[in-house]
Amino acid sequence: PTITNDGVSIAKEIELEDPYEKIGAELVKEVAKKTDDVAGDGTTTATVLAQALVKEGLRNVAAGANPLGLKRGIEKAVEKVTETLLKSAKEVETKEQIAATAGISAGDQSIGDLIAEAMDKVGNEGVITVEESNTFGLQLELTEGMRFDKG
């Protein structure tokens, strides 16, 4: 069995019989996938926010709210929240900041430290590949130039 707290991994596993529930589940899967594609993290938060928007949206429509007006209101709120987040965002620049951020995202500070070290070695334009291994532990391997695994 796989143990995960990653929203996109969990969302992919949801299969429902009821056609209306299935539409909702597909919507949440799409939210999680798009979030993962764009940000690489935050899928659980995006999934919870999507569920809250759907729940409250349906409640408001059932109470007589205009669905198009509700949609416009949500879009305005999204613009305002995005603007506020961008204003309060801070660039992650130092190796220590990268290690702290990556450690929180990975849920393991030793992984965060290794990611910061890898980023320090390859720079902002470099490529970092994470692979599973049959051995225990973490290791960093630097390949300069290009590498072709097959072919």
Swiss-Prot record:
Cell compartments where the protein resides: Cytoplasm
Biological role stated in the UniProt entry: Together with its co-chaperonin GroES, plays an essential role in assisting protein folding. The GroEL-GroES system forms a nano-cage that allows encapsulation of the non-native substrate proteins and provides a physical environment optimized to promote and accelerate protein folding.
EC number in record: 5.6.1.7
Native source species: Mycobacteroides chelonae (Mycobacterium chelonae)
Keyword Nucleotide-binding listed: yes
Catalytic activity: ATP + H2O + a folded polypeptide = ADP + phosphate + an unfolded polypeptide
GO cellular component: cytoplasm
Binding site for ATP: D41, G42, T43, T44, T45
Name this protein carries in UniProt: Chaperonin GroEL
A biological process term (GO) from this entry: protein refolding
Quaternary structure and partners: Forms a cylinder of 14 subunits composed of two heptameric rings stacked back-to-back. Interacts with the co-chaperonin GroES.
Gene3D superfamilies per the UniProt record, alphabetical: GroEL-like equatorial domain, TCP-1-like chaperonin intermediate domain
Cross-referenced Pfam families: Cpn60_TCP1
Molecular function, one GO term: isomerase activity
Keyword presence, Nucleotide-binding: yes
Sequence similarity: Belongs to the chaperonin (HSP60) family.
Keyword terms of this UniProt record: ATP-binding, Chaperone, Cytoplasm, Isomerase, Nucleotide-binding, Stress response
Chief location: cytoplasm
